[in-house]
Amino acid sequence: MALRLRLDKPWRPLTAEVVDRLPGQLGVYQIADAKGTIVYIGQAGARTAFGLRSELQREASQRASGHQFRVEVNQQYRTRWFELLMVHQADHGSLPVDNAKNPPPALGRLSPN
């Protein structure tokens, strides 16, 4: 069985109505623009009041309409966040535009192929 590194769940509209139905669980998420280009990869960690729901409520309130998101519930959210960032960097040669503004320290390299 091959290990799946990429987050391949379907995109959902980043709207308050959709986000308010999310679980209050730990995990990671991706934000994409209307064209499907990933602009941010985030995490909902243990210090987040209501996990993925509160993180994406914040994202929805700060971003223009037309953005979309997908999530993965994951108790190892920090490790998974690093994996997703490294896969994106390997696939595209750089971090997503909004992650590049404040990159994580000491991000390793990953060869997902």
What are these regions (language model features)?
Residues 54-61:
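Short, compositionally biased low-complexity segments
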Residues 62-75:
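Catalytic cores of nucleic-acid endonucleases
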Residues 82-94:
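Short, compact, well-ordered microdomains
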